[in-house]
Amino acid sequence: MKPSREELKKRLTPLQYDVTQEEGTEPPFRNEYWDEKREGLYVDIVSGEPLFSSRDKYDSGTGWPSFTRPVDPQGIVERVDRKLFTTRTEVRSRNGDSHLGHVFPDGPQPTGLRYCINSAALRFVPVEDLEQQGYGHLLHLFQ
C-alpha cells in the first residue's frame, strides 16, 4: 500500500516529493545519479520496487540517468503526457505510482528506447548490497 501524502512529505526530501508526487523534474547534470558508474540496481524511492539495472544505463548526454529498458516491463506504467505543449510518454512505477520520468524512441539498440529518469525518484543499491537489502533474486542481472 502506498504511504499517505503526509507520510511521504515526512519521508522524502522536498525535491523527491515534487518529482514523484507532483510530476516535477530535477535539473539536468545537477542530480545524484546522472553520472553514476557503479554496478547496481535502481529502485523506486517510495516503494523500493526494482526499476532499472546499471547494465542498461548509458550516457545520453541529457544530464539525467538514461536506460534502454526497465528490469521488468510489468514494473512500470506508461501514460500519455500532454503537458508543456507536446505529447510525451510518462513513466511511473507500478506499485508506488511514483512519477519517474519519460521514455523516448531515440535510444540505442537493442531497444531503441531512452528511459529518461529523475534521480530524485530513485534509490541506488550497489550490486554488493543486493542480497543484504532484499534484492538477491536479481543478482543474475549482473553475472
Curated annotation (Swiss-Prot):
Entry EC number(s): 1.8.4.12
Keywords: Oxidoreductase
GO aspect biological process, one term: protein repair
Enzyme class (EC, first level): oxidoreductase
A single MF term (Gene Ontology): peptide-methionine (R)-S-oxide reductase activity
GO cellular component, as recorded: cytoplasm
Span of domain MsrB: 5-127
Gene3D superfamilies: Peptide methionine sulfoxide reductase
Keyword Protein transport assigned: no
Basic and acidic residues composition bias: residue spans: 1-10
Family: Belongs to the MsrB Met sulfoxide reductase family.
Protein name: Peptide methionine sulfoxide reductase MsrB
Organism (species): Nitratidesulfovibrio vulgaris (strain ATCC 29579 / DSM 644 / CCUG 34227 / NCIMB 8303 / VKM B-1760 / Hildenborough) (Desulfovibrio vulgaris)
Lineage, broadest ranks: Bacteria, Pseudomonadati, Thermodesulfobacteriota, Desulfovibrionia, Desulfovibrionales
